[in-house]
Amino acid sequence: MSKKRGLSLEEKREKMLQIFYESQDFFLLKELEKMGPKKGVISQSVKDVIQSLVDDDLVAKDKIGISIYFWSLPSCAGNQLRSVRQKLESDLQGSNKRLAELVDQCEALKKGREESEERTEALTQLKDIEKKHKDLKNEMVQFADNDPATLEAKRNAIEVAHQSANRWTDNIFTLRQWCSNNFPQAKEQLEHLYTEAGITEDFDYIELSSFPLSSSHEADTAKQLVQDEA
């Protein structure tokens, strides 16, 4: 035969409230401790259950003389629930208002991304440089040696474009972190705005492969290619 399951705290609270609602009377704690077992609530737990109801304003208590009396009426619980509902509705209205303000701010931030055009230009420049760099390497395979100074200039130009692109990437990550810290309740709306702006999950810093130096004597050819990029 399986062991009978004990009552949960919420079930005990409901049982003790029934005592008040059915009698609509005032009780001392020791009286409630005697009545509790009749509802399935052991006397040792009655005090804690009653205190939890008092903490939630579902049971009232008052000291009369040297005794403390407890009472609760169905109307008291109804008033308490209505009060909680009004507070929740007020909180919801406040949250909706704040959310609307947040959406407006995010829209303004999205419209204000014109500055990131510099990053777009830097990315375009970087792609062009990488392509020319690849073409240059293919052409220089024909030569035994290359001019280190010219290749160093090429590498520096690529590095400048690379740093510029990643600087704007860092600015975007900083802005995202700021929005997450200040508007955590609007995570989904922010992610939607990021996606619309082209900031997806694979958005990250640009990694630049190493640029090998060569020792070619064909400095004029390499320098001309660098000048063409400018």
Swiss-Prot record:
The lineage of its organism: Eukaryota, Viridiplantae, Streptophyta, Embryophyta, Tracheophyta. It comes from Arabidopsis thaliana. This is Meiotic nuclear division protein 1 homolog. The keyword Nucleus applies. Belongs to the MND1 family. Expressed in reproductive tissues. GO terms for molecular function: double-stranded DNA binding. Disruption phenotype: Female and male sterility due to production of defective gametes. GO terms for cellular component: nucleolus. GO terms for biological process: double-strand break repair; embryo sac development; pollen development; reciprocal meiotic recombination; response to ionizing radiation. Interacts with HOP2, RAD51, LIM15 and MIP1. Its main location: nucleus. Required for proper homologous chromosome pairing and efficient cross-over and intragenic recombination during meiosis. Stimulates both DMC1/LIM15- and RAD51-mediated homologous strand assimilation, which is required for the resolution of meiotic double-strand breaks. Keywords: Coiled coil, DNA recombination, Meiosis, Nucleus. Residues 79-146 form a coiled coil. Transmembrane segments: none annotated. It is found in: Nucleus; Nucleus, Nucleolus. Pfam families: LZ3wCH, Mnd1. The keyword Nucleus applies.
